[in-house]
């Protein structure tokens, strides 16, 4: 879980920027987008296969 402690003289904008950076680094937003809709086993298999193909082509 991402947590940001706001300092006494720290502006809210900088704390919000730090929070957004930590969320992006932890991959929380991408995980949320991935689980937002139900994915059938067939769709999951297609997505994983496409990822494998993409990674294989990058290695060459």
Curated annotation (Swiss-Prot):
One GO process term, biological-process aspect: translation
Protein name, as recorded: Small ribosomal subunit protein bS21
Homology family: Belongs to the bacterial ribosomal protein bS21 family.
Record InterPro entries: Ribosomal_bS21, Ribosomal_bS21_CS, Ribosomal_bS21_sf
Gene Ontology cellular component list: ribonucleoprotein complex; ribosome
Superkingdom as given in the UniProt entry: Bacteria
Protein source organism: Synechocystis sp. (strain ATCC 27184 / PCC 6803 / Kazusa)
NCBIfam families (UniProt xref): S21p
Biased composition (Basic residues): 44-60
Region annotation Disordered: where it falls in the sequence: 36-60
